Amino acid sequence: MNKSIYALLCLLLLISFAAAAEKKEEEKKDYGSVIGIDLGTTYSCVGVFKKGKVEIIPNDQGNRITPSYVAFTETERLIGEAAKNQATLNPENTIFDIKRLIGRRFDDEEVQRDMKLLPYKIVSKNNKPYVVVKVKGEEKTYSPEEISAMILGRMKEIAEASLGKTVTHAVVTCPAYFNDAQRAATKDAGVIAGLEVLRVINEPTAAALAYGFDATGDKEKNILVYDLGGGTFDVSVLSIEDGVFEVRSTNGDTHLGGEDFDQRVMKHFLTVFQKKTGKDASKDKKSLQKLRRAAENAKRILSTSPQTQLEIENFFDGKDLIETLTRAKFEELNMDLFKKTLDPVKKVLEDAKFKKSQIHEVVLVGGSTRIPKIQQLLKDFFNGKEPNRGVHPDEAVAYGAAVQGGIFTNEEGTDTLVLLDIAPLTLGIETVGGVMTALIPRGTFVPTKKSQVFSTYQDNQDRVSIQIYEGERSMTKDNNLLGKFDLSGIPPAQRGVPQIEVTFEMDVNGILHVSAEDKASGSKESITITNDKERLSQADIDRMVKEAADAADEDKAAKERVEAKNTLENYIYQIKNTIGDKDKIGGKIESDDKETIETAISDALSWLDVNSSAEKEEFDEQYKILEKIVQPIFSKLYGAAGGSPNGAGEDMPNHDEL
């Protein structure tokens, strides 16, 4: 990509938002200081842009990252270090890893698996996971949004203590592969915390801002951001030039990170302990919490030392756990997970249409990228290229979020920055035959607004159902239903005549709004896809993309079959309407010819009734049979009138049907 393309993109953005900018100038709000928050699975971080640079704000313990822990005791609620420090004594009432629950369904396979390893109780409310704790002796349930809000509230307090003023606006990060429900839930958590979330920004994009903000020179650079944190994994390819950050592709796994590596270590030592003592500690919550902390600490030490020792006094049933863990053993326990992270790396390169050699920098983000084997695997994959460790792995995401906050407040040094992010999955509606008709293809820059005109499937149809789907397959049955609504009040008309404009609008946070309007009557309905809709689990997203690749030929054949059927059916009804119009051809056609056509139409409709599941070739053959009968008659009529010989329905609208 050269400078002229970047300049054109910037110009288009300026033109698109010029009117809105004028209006905003009149009613411009004073946001005050807009903070950037990295709401992490295991740790969170907050920063602010001021005086031309980003400041990462330490908490009251002097630490620049804060554990994403919330605990409830008999007398108080604890957040951060204080909550984590008492976790082994109060495991049932200490909440962590809440990011792995936010925006998910209770029956999600990954939620069910996590429940077996988490010491606190999780219950279902309308198929959403809620945590159950004892608060001052009474049992209470909290949604993941509420727990997340407590952590966000703590980060807000940390910022306010440093800035000496109230903070009301923030930019919050989330994994690039978070779906709509997870993004909406993250925004909701901000509202609960008393923050207006101006933007939900993708974590690898934020990290790229951190990397590129101080970069000198205007030469185009392609970077791959490899973001492996405590609970989630993202990888994105971006092109950076002249302050424009363009996301080219993104992929990841919202349920893969350092916590999974810890769990492998925990399972290993539970097995070792049972073999040596004959005692099973896997169901004891206090023992598990002790082991979880020891495993996390061992993992950290092994990033710089070849071995370490776990020492847990009175681990279970009066027995101590004292064992050695080598780096080699740690790598053996997790090698399949380490290698699993390379699959999304391959996918983003493929989606961006880049070769390995076209990536100028591989930027490491997230605490888990400190693991030497991870760094070695990436170096080998990129043919010996050393990964870039120039950004702070724990702080880069909050840094980028703070830069975005600075853009909102027009801070010095941010005026030339332009960020172009993308939609992670294709969005569309169902049309006749169960076809997925895409309005926003995967990889489209956001924010975006796309409209398309559709029509009715039956004569005098007074309402249509708009069903919204997300996924990569060509048939809706293989994709995920996000929501649906009906548009009624359509004036009676022949099929294919009404014009129904469907508009998809995705905002900068990746949240979707859909509307439909009948152009004749002005009747309009809309829906915002929000967190209360049943949404995808990460497994669903991964399955969709994989199945779409595996079943591309099958998808193509199914779509072609439906299109062939629709073409035949439309042709039949166009002919029927044409010969029935007495003011035009219907009034000029000879009775014998009309009878011939009516018989052919009747035969074709009867064949369709019996053979609705026929193959594409059979529908094509029926079309040719009908055309062979009808075409000579219409050609004769149009020839006599000096008109077009192409006959039936040449003035009929040609829209996909709902």
Swiss-Prot record:
Similarity comment text for this entry: Belongs to the heat shock protein 70 family.
Signal peptide limits: 1-20
Subcellular location: Endoplasmic reticulum lumen
Protein name (Swiss-Prot/TrEMBL): Luminal-binding protein 2
A Gene Ontology term for the protein's cellular component: nucleus
Keywords recorded for this protein, A-Z: ATP-binding, Chaperone, Endoplasmic reticulum, Glycoprotein, Nucleotide-binding, Signal
Signal found in the keyword field: yes
Keyword Repeat in annotation: no
Protein task: Probably plays a role in facilitating the assembly of multimeric protein complexes inside the ER.
InterPro entries per the UniProt record, alphabetical: ATPase_NBD (IPR043129), BIP_NBD (IPR042050), Heat_shock_70_CS (IPR018181), HSP70_C_sf (IPR029048), HSP70_peptide-bd_sf (IPR029047), Hsp_70_fam (IPR013126)
Domain of life of the organism encoding this protein: Eukaryota
Glycan-bearing residues: N611
GO BP: chaperone cofactor-dependent protein refolding; endoplasmic reticulum unfolded protein response; ERAD pathway; protein refolding; response to mercury ion
GO MF annotation terms: ATP binding; ATP hydrolysis activity; ATP-dependent protein folding chaperone; heat shock protein binding; protein folding chaperone
PANTHER family associated with the record: HEAT SHOCK PROTEIN 70KDA
Motif (Prevents secretion from ER): 655-658
Main subcellular localisation: endoplasmic reticulum
